[in-house]
Amino acid sequence: SNYIHRPLRIHEEEMRETRCLNKKTVSTDSIYRFTSQDPGSFEIILTATNQDGKDSDTLFLKVNGNRFAISDLKNWTGNGENTSVFAIQWVTGEHLQEPADQEVFFIAWGYRWNKTETFTGIDMLKAIAKNDPRLYVALSGNYIKGFGYDGNNDGKIELKSSTLHLTQADFTNGLYELSEYDSDELKPLDAADYWMGSNDAYTTYWLGSGNQVPTAADFEYSQTFVDNRQLENLSWDVWTLSPIDYTSMVNVSPIPRLIKAAEANK
């Protein structure tokens, strides 16, 4: 039996013969794998029983906290006891589905809010866009059309398509309202800046929870729009951008191992 002081997931992987006496098997070992969503130290008491009695021993496990955690965030918006995470994954190369690591720019912000109040994903997004002058969001109502970021922190962003030319002056509190006709093929003119969205890629919304960034398998594609998504303590709202090909339309998943903290405001 196992007594665990802190929550761990236990998976029995296999049974293996380990000890024989006079060519007879006298015991087998069960092999277990222990996993945890959170880092920390864990005490496990193991008890073995046979016809001669029983004995116990204690194991101490330490789960390494190498995964990106909420405590790693640098750029915070809001006040309150609860925390949520907002993150965007840009891809600079042509292959959105299978980018090289160096083509991925994936950053996260923190959002604090009062547990006695109710906030949605759009509330968090707008608050962070207002607070961080490097973040730019194009939307149509509450539909997110695209995300931009001032990569070299020069206080400027410039986006251009065949029909539209935007600068930082066109954004109010980090937001710009686009029509369905004027957002096609926007590109940043400064190679150090980031932009993805418009009509060649659609924003894709993923949800997760926990003190650390969820694994790719633990992120769930959101079944609700951002204005209907109610925040929970330790919730994660992550945006990727997926190619519009009008055939497979496969959503691009987050790549958690590449996430890092958005820099704090100057």
Each predicted region: which residue ranges?
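Extracellular and select intracellular beta-sandwich modules with Ser/Thr-enriched
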Residues: 28, 53-59
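Exposed beta-strand face motif in extracellular beta-rich ectodomains
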Residues: 40-44
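A short beta-strand segment in extracellular, disulfide-stabilized domains
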Residues: 1-12
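Surface-exposed, flexible coil segments in extracellular/virion-facing regions
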Residues: 18-35
